[in-house]
Structure formats: C-alpha cells, structure tokens
Amino acid sequence: MPATNLVGLDLVGIGHRYRDTTVLHDIDLTVEPGEFVSFLGPSGVGKSTLLRIIAGLEQPTHGVVESTGGTSGGTMSRMMFQEDRLLPWRNVLDNVQLGTRHQRERALELLYDVGLAGREKDWPSELSGGQRQRVALARALLHQPDVLLLDEPFGALDAITRVAMQQLLERVLAEQPRTVLLVTHDVEEALVLSDRVLLLTDQGITRDLRIPHARPRHRGDAQLAAWKEELLDGLLQADNALSSL
C-alpha cells in the first residue's frame, strides 16, 4: 500500500454500554495514517470492544468513527484474533483465500512472506500454534486492509514463538505499511512494536505514550525498560481501582 494511500482514524466521543454496564467512556482518539497504536489495560475496560466498533462489528452507544486520508473508496479493516479461526476442513491455501476470488498467486506470495512457502496444501492440524497464526496473518493481509486490527493475536503462544511473530509482523509492515491497532496484555510487546502505547482504564485513556525509537528495537534498551515499569505501575493501579468497585 503506497504511503500516500494510508488511512487514519478519528474516534469522537465513543461510548458503549452492555445493559447496565458502561465499558467505554467518551473515547476521543486520533490515529495518524500508518501509525501503530497499542492498547493496554485491565480486563473488562472495553479494549476488544473498541476494536470491534472500529471494525464495524459492533455499534457504539454514542460517538462516531471516521477515517482520514487514503482514497475516497471507503475504509476496510480486518481483525486478527488470539484464536487463529482456521477452518479445519480447508487446507492452508484455502484458508488464506477464504472470502476472496482469483487470489491464488497473491495468497502464495503471502505464505512465502510469512515463512510458510510449500505448506499451502497442509491441513491446519499439521501446523503448530505459531504457524497457524502465520496463516491467519496472511489471510488478514490478503484483503489489503487499510486498518489492521489485532486482538491479542499472539497471546496464546509460547515466549519464543511470540517474539518470532512480533519480528515477522515488523518485517511485513516494513514492506507493506498500514495503520495498525493492537490490543495486548504484554507491555514489552506494545513497547517493541508501537509508535504509541495507550493505557485504557475505566476512566478512559489515561496514558498516551509516544515511542520515538526507530524499529527494530533492542529489548534491553534502558528507556524502554523505564517505560515498561511506568506502564506496569499504571496497569496495577487501574486493576486495583476496578477491584475496589
């Protein structure tokens, strides 16, 4: 996707209620075209709900989501979840092409990009958890989304596979820039991947940390370590506040 066609987002007054429970409180947020933004926060504050609202899978109780930049053809987003959601009765290539037509060559290119060249005829049951998530990433990218929405996509993976997937995502985005929103419980993951890290609590967005470091980032960097401690402290305070309600 050419840099000039990148899409940004404006969230204005987004609020959401489930019956008598409010999970999002008047969220105002501007995401610049091509920006990578991560959301941290305690469970139950609406992080995944916010992604679903941006994707159009849920409607906010109030507020609007608007796109900025790009072309006039509308904004298309794709979500990638913690569960790979592959169809077990379809092979790898068919899973990548799901919902599209005449995309075989592009699907094969993406499987190469994610390190699964030659595995297109395999069944999901023949793949490891990390490999299945690679297929899910290729499937999301095949649709060439303006906005890639990642809901804890690596949360179920072991530590080594998680780092490998983070590095893969970095490489793919370096070659195919796009706007990305990530929900994660892994503070280090957010700091390594993101341009901005937002702390979402029951009070709304209480921290907006901008990371000026170039990528790839060294995980032992002293400044990243200091930010990690700061964010962990904020998460602990937010979790304690929720527990006391």
Curated annotation (Swiss-Prot):
One of its GO terms (molecular function) is ATP hydrolysis activity. Keywords: ATP-binding, Cell membrane, Membrane, Nucleotide-binding, Translocase, Transport. The keyword Nucleotide-binding applies. It is found in: Cell membrane. Its main location: membrane. This is Aliphatic sulfonates import ATP-binding protein SsuB 1. The complex is composed of two ATP-binding proteins (SsuB), two transmembrane proteins (SsuC) and a solute-binding protein (SsuA). InterPro entries: AAA+_ATPase, ABC_transporter-like_ATP-bd, ABC_transporter-like_CS, ABC_transporter_ATP-bind, P-loop_NTPase. It comes from Rhodococcus jostii (strain RHA1).
